[in-house]
């Protein structure tokens, strides 16, 4: 083998090895450094105009060289460009400014609270139970939200952005034109029905959620064709032509999901439909997001994301059958009707 070939092979091995080490062994370091950028709104700062690292250091009250080290760390990741010690953001990192759509997601996922929440994940897998809440001293995830105002605020902001990313694909790629009344089960601030009543002039929307959620939602969508109803989907839901459950059932195990579906079944009209927007894990085409969410809901709630076979088995145990599937929406859509 030629010397140049040996050198090339050696270099490739070096790069592949360190890519693995830095991605899987040191990802926590990148996340914590990234959190410094998010907490100091550095992407917004540089988005206004490229800045010398010394100017940035002065604004955020950092040591100049420490600031330079932090900024240059993310140049190979494509988040900054550097020219004569002046840093600018890239098309990629424009999504990380506060109005970019994922600012709160990135800030929460790289936060100390989130790291703390995952400190017990080895035990969750070892014991096959959700020990995420135990990292905060609780058995139930929602007790963290109820008692920790900082966590509650960050979590709600993150969830709002998570929802905002998916809603446009849902509205664009789902036909609600045949329905008079749509209930968004667990609908929180009413964003989905808010978009639906704008698109369909004859449609009425009901946002159904817990009383505490309805009363505390500061961004509640107001419209003459939108009604807010409080209650528990384990007890009763309003009567409607269509029930939307977006990222609801993945928070619950099969037994609880069957209870939710049974409750809805009691209020359904003859031709009512259930629109379930949730991940459908494809064993032949795994998606990073689906599997990230699967691990997350397991660690938080002892629940799961489901494959198509899992969804079919769930329906077999209930009053419902799957009429159709839409893989274009994010998350995917399963349309259910009574058997």
Swiss-Prot record:
S-adenosyl-L-methionine binds at residues 186, 209, 232-233, 246. The active site is at 250 (proton acceptor). GO terms for molecular function: 3,5-dichloro-THPH methyl transferase activity; O-methyltransferase activity; S-adenosylmethionine-dependent methyltransferase activity. Keywords: Methyltransferase, S-adenosyl-L-methionine, Transferase. GO terms for biological process: biosynthetic process; methylation. Its EC number is 2.1.1.-. This is O-methyltransferase 7. The gene is omt7.
């Amino acid at each position: 083998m030629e010397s140049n070939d040996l050198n090339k092979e050696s270099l490739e091995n070096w790069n592949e090895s360190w890519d693995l080490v830095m991605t899987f062994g040191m990802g926590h370091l990148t996340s914590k450094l990234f959190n410094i950028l998010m907490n100091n709104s550095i992407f917004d700062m540089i988005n206004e105009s490229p800045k010398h690292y010394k100017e940035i250091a002065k604004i955020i009250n950092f040591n100049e060289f420490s600031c330079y080290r932090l900024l240059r760390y993310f140049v190979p990741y494509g988040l900054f460009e550097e020219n004569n010690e002046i840093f600018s953001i890239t098309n990629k990192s424009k999504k990380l400014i506060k109005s970019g759509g994922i600012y709160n997601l990135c800030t929460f996922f790289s936060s100390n609270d989130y790291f703390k929440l995952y400190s017990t994940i080895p035990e969750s897998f070892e014991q096959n139970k959700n020990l995420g809440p135990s990292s905060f001293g609780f058995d139930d995830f929602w007790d963290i939200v109820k008692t920790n105002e900082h966590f509650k605020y960050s979590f709600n902001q993150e969830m709002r952005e998570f929802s905002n990313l998916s809603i446009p694909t849902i509205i664009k790629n789902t036909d609600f034109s045949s329905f008079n009344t749509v209930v968004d089960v667990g609908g929180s601030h009413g964003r989905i029905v808010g978009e639906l009543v704008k698109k369909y002039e004859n449609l009425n929307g009901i946002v159904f959620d817990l009383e505490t959620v309805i009363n505390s939602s500061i961004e509640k969508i107001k419209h003459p064709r939108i009604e807010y109803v409080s209650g528990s989907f384990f007890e009763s839901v309003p009567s409607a032509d269509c029930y939307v459950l977006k990222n609801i059932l993945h928070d619950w195990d099969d037994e609880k999901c069957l209870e939710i579906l049974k409750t809805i079944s009691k209020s359904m009209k003859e031709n009512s439909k259930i629109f379930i927007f949730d991940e459908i894990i494809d064993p032949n085409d795994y998606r990073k997001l689906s599997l990230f969410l699967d691990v997350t809901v397991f660690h938080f709630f002892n629940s799961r994301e489901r494959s198509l076979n899992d969804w079919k088995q769930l329906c077999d145990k209930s009053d419902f059958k799957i009429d159709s599937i839409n893989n274009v929406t994010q998350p995917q859509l399963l349309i259910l009707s009574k058997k």
